[in-house]
Regions:
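NTP-dependent small-molecule kinase module
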Residues: 2-10, 31, 35, 144-194
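Walker A/P-loop
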Residues: 26
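Short glycine-rich anion-binding loops that position phosphate/pyrophosphate groups of nucleotides
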Residues: 90-93, 113-115, 163-164
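A glycine- and Lys/Arg-enriched "phosphate-lid" helix/loop adjacent to the NTP-binding pocket
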Residues: 104-148
Length: 194
């Protein structure tokens, strides 16, 4: 993100996690939020709660376009909450409107290797984009497509491959930008949890 864009926007008071599926966004997000004493939101889980059905069912019934519309609507709501940690869906940053919404917070990309993602998802049958015979190839394709977008959107990144989630959170908390966000929130700029 360009410095001039950040200067024009209000200083962030929330942390948004982006990255590939199974990169650790939910696990690390929960630990980070608990450590900060902030609410944690996972965009996909919030969509499931509101709709009453699994993401895979939404993909089946409404297609990817229907899911993406729900995702953008949920992101618009969650990115407006100050003092929150929000885990975004892996494909969310691929859309202009969602990239604009991400400018409301400090964006951290969680990076993981193909082999780690493959290992973490090997028994997972709920991810619509991995319902293919060659999962490793599909993950590589998604990384090639999404990686440059993640990098362009992120304010910072952390490698999560083979890393202990608590250590990853320690690295995030050590970022000067995160310390500044924490100070702003502690000074009273936090909203109410949902």
């Amino acid at each position: 993100m360009q410095d001039t864009e950040r200067k024009e926007a209000a200083l962030p008071t929330s942390i948004f996690l982006i990255g590939m599926m199974a990169s650790g966004k939910s696990t690390i997000g929960k630990i980070l939020a608990r450590t900060l004493g902030w609410p944690f939101f996972d965009v996909d889980r919030e969509i499931e709660k509101r709709s009453g059905v699994a993401i895979s069912t939404i993909f089946e019934l409404e297609g990817e376009a229907g899911f993406r519309a729900r995702e953008t609507q949920m992101m618009a709501e969650l990115t407006a909450k100050p003092g929150a940690v929000v885990a975004m869906g892996g494909g969310a940053p691929m859309f202009d409107i969602n990239r604009t919404l991400l400018k409301r917070g400090f964006v951290i990309e969680l990076r993981s290797s193909v082999s780690d993602i493959l290992e973490r998802t090997r028994r997972d049958t709920t991810r619509p984009l991995l319902q293919t015979e060659d999962r490793a190839r599909r993950i590589r394709e998604l990384l090639l497509e999404r990686g440059p977008v993640y990098t362009s959107v992120a304010d910072a990144f952390v490698v999560t491959s083979r890393a202990n989630p608590e250590r990853v959170v320690e690295r995030i908390l050590a970022m000067p930008e995160v310390a500044a966000i924490r100070a702003r929130v502690d000074a009273g700029q936090r909203g109410e949890p949902a």
